[in-house]
Swiss-Prot record:
<keyword id="KW-0472">Membrane</keyword>
<dbReference type="GO" id="GO:0005886">
    <property type="term" value="C:plasma membrane"/>
</dbReference>
<keyword id="KW-1003">Cell membrane</keyword>
<feature type="transmembrane region" description="Helical">
    <location>
        <begin position="9"/>
        <end position="29"/>
    </location>
</feature>
<dbReference type="GO" id="GO:0051701">
    <property type="term" value="P:biological process involved in interaction with host"/>
</dbReference>
<protein>
    <recommendedName>
        <fullName>Uncharacterized membrane protein ArfB</fullName>
    </recommendedName>
</protein>
<comment type="function">
    <text>Required for wild-type expression of ArfA and ammonia secretion, not however part of an ammonia transporter.</text>
</comment>
<keyword id="KW-1133">Transmembrane helix</keyword>
<comment type="similarity">
    <text>Belongs to the ArfB membrane protein family.</text>
</comment>
<keyword id="KW-0812">Transmembrane</keyword>
Length: 50
């Protein structure tokens, strides 16, 4: 029974670490996409606005 409890703890730790990694990667991709979109937006000088 000790093996099952230890294995369950390792499984929970793995799932928790995977969830944290997924959140970090998802947020960094969203932030990079948002920054990239802002960099590609034309400025007022490029659009001819005065």
């Amino acid at each position: 029974m000790d093996f099952v409890i230890q294995w369950s703890c390792y499984l929970l730790a793995f799932l928790g670490g995977s969830a944290v990694a997924w959140v970090v990667v998802t947020l960094s991709i969203k932030r990079a996409s948002r920054d990239e979109g802002a960099a590609e937006a034309p400025s007022a000088a490029e659009t001819g606005a005065q």
